[in-house]
A protein has these predicted regions:
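ABC-family P-loop ATPase nucleotide-binding domain
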Residues: 1-53, 288-290
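C-terminal boundary and immediately downstream tail of ABC-type ATPase nucleotide-binding domains
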Residues: 22, 265-290
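ABC family nucleotide-binding domain
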Residues: 42-264
Length: 290
């Protein structure tokens, strides 16, 4: 470790107590998320998925997927590993090209767009593996998008990044590199980076799956506060408590299809489909045996 890194590490350790206090998000600040993320009094469909299918080689991963996301929705997608959840999210973000079907964003079929990067400015993604630039500082990770894509000036991009780093309790770590952060801290930086692009929708692909158990709560708390602020979110998750308490719609997938969807209370207390019941029973058993 270089002298500079050692000094930064010592400084970060000295700030740990302060950061833990800052992790509880300032409710006043969070209500200032850009208006595009606020919940309208009347619901408006932002994303409509119609007859979506995806085939890799001879394997049909997604089959005839249909669902809508309205402004302010928190949609949690649950299901066993390999059920197609993450592939669906990657199709919605156009990281994967659907084999068939349409994805409408404000009524426009984005599967036919020639400007996927422009679309991703409004529908951005937080990955399970963070995907931070290891050679850049925390602040630079959060300003590179606004500066390169949104063409913000340096001072403006810094101000936007600091706003959201403060929001997620990471403003004291702006000079740190990702290797100096815990998994939970990296994911909070990734969330701040996504927010800095002023998106209308954030897609979360199992954002806690790569974290140690003690780090999960801090990330879920940030996401809960964002949901309460009216940010539209689609979350692939194995965190059933989060899905039950925070989502307003839960989608259960199995074998590449949507088996059942509905309000959390209906899905978790009186699911209609046997496959849904079996999955939830397995999840409950795993939690009890953990």
């Amino acid at each position: 470790m270089t002298t500079t890194d050692a000094n930064t590490s010592r400084q970060n350790e000295e700030n740990t107590e302060q950061i833990m206090e800052n992790t509880a998000i300032d409710t006043q600040n969070i209500t200032n998320i850009d208006n595009t993320a606020q919940l309208d009094s009347q619901s408006e469909s932002i994303i409509e998925v119609r007859h979506l299918g995806k085939i890799f080689g001879t394997h049909e991963v997604l089959k005839d997927i249909d669902f809508d996301v309205q402004k302010g929705d928190v949609t949690c997608i649950i299901g066993s590993s390999g059920s197609g959840k993450s592939t669906l999210l990657r199709c919605i973000n156009l990281f994967e090209t659907p084999t068939v079907g349409e994805i409408y964003f404000h009524g426009e079929d984005v599967t036919k767009t020639k400007s996927a990067p422009k679309y991703r400015e409004k529908v951005t993604m937080v990955f399970q593996s963070f995907n931070l630039f290891n050679n850049l500082s925390v602040l630079a990770n959060c300003t590179i998008g606004p500066r390169k894509v949104l063409k913000m000036k340096k001072d403006e991009a810094n101000a936007v990044a600091m706003k959201y780093l403060e929001l997620v309790g990471m403003s004291a770590y702006i000079n740190a590199k990702p290797r100096q952060l815990s998994g939970g801290q990296k994911q909070r930086v990734a969330i701040a980076r996504a927010l800095a692009m002023s998106p209308e929708v954030i897609l979360f692909d199992e954002p806690t799956s790569a974290l140690d158990p003690e780090m999960v709560g801090e990330v879920l708390e940030v996401m809960k506060e964002l949901a309460e602020a009216g940010l539209t979110m689609i979350v692939v998750t194995h965190e059933m408590t989060f899905a039950r308490d925070v989502a307003n719609k839960v989608v259960f997938m199995d074998g590449g299809v949507i088996v059942e969807e509905g309000a959390p209370e209906q899905i978790f207390t009186s699911p209609k489909e046997e496959r849904t019941k079996a999955f939830l029973s397995r999840m409950l058993a795993e939690k009890q045996n953990a």
